[in-house]
Amino acid sequence: VNGYIANGTVSKRHGTGSPVIVPYQTFDTADHPICLAPGNDRLWALCAKVLGRDEWATDPQFAKSAQRVAHKTELLPMIAEALKAKPRAEWLELMEKAGVPCAAVNDIGELARTEQMEASKLIQQLPGGPKVVGLPISFDHVRPHSPRSAPTLGEHTDEVLGSLPK
C-alpha cells in the first residue's frame, strides 16, 4: 500500500492455490481476478453449475475432492477458460447468489479505495503532508493517528543550533 499511495506503483500478484483443495485459488476473469473457494463437494457442484458445466460435478475425475486434486492439471485450465467468459462483477454476483465462497482479488489501488480500508482509517493524511499507512493496530477500537509530518529540511536548525553550548 505504501508504494501505491506514494507513487501509484501497483505490485504484481502471485499465483495462489491449495495443494489439498481444488479449486481453491485465484483465476482471471474477462476483466479482473477472482478467488474461488468451493471447499467441499457440495460447493463444488454449485460452482460447476454456475460455470455452466454441471457435468463436472458428476464426472468421475472431478466429482470428489481427492479426484479434483489428482486431476487438477486437467481441471484448472478448464475452470480458467470458463471464467474468462464474463467480468468479475458478474461472476461474483452469480457465485454469491449460489452460495459459492468467492471474493474479488484487488490490486493495491483497488484495496486502497475500498470501504473497509476507509472504515479502518488505515490510510491517514498527515497535517500538511502526504498520506501514509497508519499503525495496523487499534486500542479500544481507535487507531492511533500520526500527529504530524516529518519536519521540512532546516525546519528546526535554529532551535537545534541555539541549544548547543557556545
Label the model's feature ranges.
Residues G17-V20:
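Short solvent-exposed loop/turn micro-motifs enriched in small/polar/acidic residues
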Residues M117-I123:
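Short low-complexity, flexible loop/linker segments enriched in glycine and/or proline
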Residues A63, L126-K166:
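Flexible, small-/acidic-enriched active-site or ligand-binding loops
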Residues V22-A98, C102:
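Aromatic-enriched alpha-helical interface/lid elements that frame and gate functional surfaces
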Residues D41-R42, E110, P144:
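Short, glycine-/Ser/Thr-/acidic-enriched flexible segments
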Residues V1-G15:
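Substrate-binding/catalytic subdomain of NAD(P)-dependent oxidoreductase enzymes
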Residues E96-M117:
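Conserved PLP cofactor-binding pocket of PLP-dependent enzymes
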